[in-house]
Amino acid sequence: MYYYLHELKEYDIRIIGLDLKKEVIRHCNELSEKYGYEKLRFLEGDIADYTGVNKVDMVVTLHACDTATDYALAKAVGWDAKVILSVPCCQHELNRQIRNEVLEPVLRYGLLKERMAALITDGLRAQYLEREGYEAQILELSLIHI
């Protein structure tokens, strides 16, 4: 993303990446230094607690697990981000809570329950963004077509 926006499109950008895994952060910072990306840095930390900026133009979440996606979306809205791109990961929070007597014949199958929880969670996230004034789309990124 940095390469595309900074090198190809020639935007004057700064990108901060967050992750909880120290090894991931170390590796990403090594790559940033290797390629001379001076305004690309990675920090170990939780998006829910991050206070390093007051305003951003774009927020991207990539496989932010469980409620980390929700915290990132709330931060993006709070920062009044112009663009939000979110690729959520697992949705364990709703998966643990979803119970419905009528749907029990379907929900008893773990895979179907997991997918239903993911769809409902993504729908609720899209509605939250729309309620906050954003246009929202839900798309599926499938590796089958790549």
Regions found by a protein language model. Name each.
Residues 1-10:
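Conserved SAM-binding loop of SAM-dependent methyltransferases across substrates and taxa
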Residues 14-19:
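Conserved SAM-binding motif I beta-strand of class I
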Residues 27-54:
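S-adenosyl-L-methionine
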Residues 67-75:
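A short, conserved alpha-helix within the catalytic core of class I
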Residues 82-94:
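Conserved beta-strand signature within the Rossmann-like core of class I S-adenosyl-L-methionine
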Residues 119-132:
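Short alpha-helix
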Residues 135-142:
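Conserved S-adenosyl-L-methionine
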Residues 144-146:
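Conserved small/polar residues in nucleotide/adenosyl-binding loops
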